[in-house]
Amino acid sequence: MAMFKKRFIKKSEDGKVAKPKRKLDVDGFESDSDDVLEKETKSSSQGIKKHKPINGTKKPTRDVEHGQNSSTGNALSNPSLDQATTDKSAGEKSVGPIKPPPISIKTTTITDFQPDVCKDFLQTGYCGYGDTCKFLHIRDESKQRKPIEKEWETVTEQQKPDKSKEQVPYRCVLCSKDYTSPVKTECNHLFCQKCFMNRYRNLKKPNCFICGKDTGGVCSPVSKKELEKLIS
């Protein structure tokens, strides 16, 4: 006996084998889809009922708030605000000044257009009061008279000025004028020859006018080059 039955496949008019068509049960499919939708709606409604709002929190609404106090509206319109809040919560410090500087703090500058300068020191470079003088000992004018080349030479050579050179006045102390035929005493102080001899002969004061040492009327002439070295 034959175990299997023979199947006869119909051929189309062209001679090709026609594929069998499957029939779908449309009524059953629609009923199944309706059942699935009903189950999903029931489960979603039950889930919403289970979640209760926490005390102190507002329910979300679709009303958009306008202004600076709006939190939901700004968050929806500007997503960058959400990033800023997350950055602050992460602990990042804000950049820039937190508070403006106080208005009470102001800077004031005072310029003295008429300073109290010692007249004797300005004219002659010597003052009898010394460091105890209450006026300023400034030699701005004498500094401007110096040539630039000599200042540059002193900077390059880095020579330390002697105390004797610092104490030499650039004008005669007796007449308050430039030196005319200058002379130097034993104590290395400069005077005009006329002023020194007038003080020694007429006033009969043999002591030095600056240091008070007895000179005995002895002095030595000073050349122009030596005078420039002593004054500069």
Swiss-Prot record:
This is Pre-mRNA-splicing factor CWC24. A zinc finger (C3H1-type) spans 112-140. GO terms for cellular component: Prp19 complex; U2-type spliceosomal complex. Keywords: DNA-binding, Metal-binding, mRNA processing, mRNA splicing, Nucleus, Spliceosome, Zinc, Zinc-finger. It comes from Debaryomyces hansenii (strain ATCC 36239 / CBS 767 / BCRC 21394 / JCM 1990 / NBRC 0083 / IGC 2968). It comes from the Eukaryota. GO terms for biological process: generation of catalytic spliceosome for first transesterification step; snoRNA splicing. Residues 1-107 are annotated as: Disordered. Pfam families: zf-C3HC4_3 (PF13920), zf-CCCH (PF00642). InterPro entries: CWC24-like (IPR039971), Znf_CCCH (IPR000571), Znf_CCCH_sf (IPR036855), Znf_RING (IPR001841), Znf_RING/FYVE/PHD (IPR013083). A zinc finger (RING-type) spans 172-212. Belongs to the CWC24 family. The keyword Transcription does not apply. Its main location: nucleus. One of its GO terms (molecular function) is DNA binding. The keyword Glycoprotein does not apply. It is found in: Nucleus. Involved in pre-mRNA splicing. Residues 67-88 have a biased composition (Polar residues). Associated with the spliceosome.
